Amino acid sequence: MTEKHLLKDMTWVEFRERLAENPVILLPFGSQEEQGPMAPMGDWMLTEAIADRIAREAGAIAAPTMPFGYADYFRPIPGGIAFRPDTFRRVLEDICENFLNHGLDHLVVFNGHSGNFPLVDQTIRKIKEERGVLIPCLNVWRLMTAKEWEAFHPQGMKAFGHGGDPLTSVYLHLFPELMRMDLAEPSPEPGTLLDLPTAGLNAVKFQGVDINLAVDVTDRAANGVAGGDPTQSAAEIGEKMTNFIVEFTVDFIRHFKTVETRTHKK
């Protein structure tokens, strides 16, 4: 029988049998948030699908995907579900503790929502201090460098942005039946706050310098497309991006299996 690689599919006896090998446990996190007018709000589905493939190819075990994250700047648009910062930190810590308490110390956070990362960083630092275990975090959509963007997308890094790529192209590759490309439209000119143009979702520009500010997505773009141009997205681009993310993460997991993660024991 083929070895199972998804924790949700395993019996507890099957999982217990894997404990001796101290497998790498992939912890996928995503978000329930708007992704422009043409894409489903459940972007955690992308993280889940990619994590499934990675775990299968790397001999790892993928935990169930956490579909909610920290996404305060998307609250003005209905349909999103976001944790408070403290809730997110507690959820991640509790998930990690459940594995650490059984001696599993090769955990990898597979983060499919960039807004989660500051809270992930705070939590894995706390675990390092209190449990003496190093837990890496791979930010899914930041794994591609400018080199990959130039190779995969005719617009290069200019295509990157919330509501643009990589998510739109990856959606077209993995879930084309859910897409409404008839509603796709480019990112509009940045909105303004304090009579200054918004720059992303956490700043405005003043004399070419980013000034941090509490920017909501609707301050930046009424249509929810805060960067890039989803009309230029394509399933073929998404396939290349997905393959790269899988191959990179599988390579990392194979390395991670071979190293010690404990800095001390408490």
Protein language model annotation of sequence segments:
Residues 1-106, 114-266:
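Extended, histidine- and acidic-residue-enriched regions that form the cofactor-binding/catalytic faces
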